[in-house]
Amino acid sequence: MATLIYVDKENEEPGTLVATKDGLKLGSGPSIKALDGRSQVSTSRFGKTFDAATALPKATRKALGTVNRATEKSVKTNGPLKQKQPSFSAKKMTEKTVKAKSSVPASDDAYPEIEKLFPFNPLGFESFNLPEEHQIAHLPLSGVPLMILDEERELEKLFQLGPPLPLKMPSPPWESNLLQSPSSILLTLDVELPPVCSDIDI
């Protein structure tokens, strides 16, 4: 048997609750409350109840019957225990804030300034732009193959040659003159085959 004594916060009158440990779990047994000399017996009810005093507020409408029954039981059993919960939560919150304050590292002392360890200037990176005296935007470079030069003297020779021109690809013979007769086009497509060997038996 466990006897728990609580003080009613609104009326400041002591009220006692006498219940077994098993009776506090899930509303398995009846709990007897003695407040102001009146004794009330509350038992867990199953199914629909039509009493106005025990009706749930409008916020908890009955959507699923089993869920609402479980919430009714938890509200009935945990009702007198709600007065102790804020004290525990306040203690836990103060412990958490103390831990958070102690875990916050010092901003300047613990860590060096990482930004100054790797200094860089975005303008100091390699620029792949050509200098102004070697601008090639005005040159027609469509079709020019990529040329890789090994030495700088070959680069000077390239600038002495003048602007490069696109290469002229030779057109295939069947596309060179569309006005040719089909027989002349077929003659260009003829391929000489090796002579037939009559000695081999098939």
UniProtKB/Swiss-Prot annotation:
Motif D-box: chain residues: 61-64
According to its UniProt entry, the protein's GO biological process terms are: chromosome organization; homologous chromosome segregation
Where is it localised?
Cytoplasm; Nucleus
Renumbered ranges of motif SH3-binding: 163-173
Q: Which UniProt keywords apply?
A: Cytoplasm, Nucleus, Proto-oncogene, SH3-binding
Q: List GO terms (cellular component aspect).
A: cytoplasm; nucleus
Q: Which GO terms describe its molecular function?
A: SH3 domain binding
For the region Disordered, what residue ranges are annotated?
67-92
Q: What InterPro entries does the annotation carry? A: Securin_separation_inhibitor
Query: What is a single Pfam family found in this protein's UniProt entry?
Result: Securin
Q: Is the keyword Nucleus in the record?
A: yes
Query: What does UniProt say about this protein's domains?
Result: The N-terminal destruction box (D-box) acts as a recognition signal for degradation via the ubiquitin-proteasome pathway.
Family of the protein in this entry: Belongs to the securin family.
Any idea what this protein is called? Putative pituitary tumor-transforming gene 3 protein
Q: Which organism is it from?
A: Pongo pygmaeus
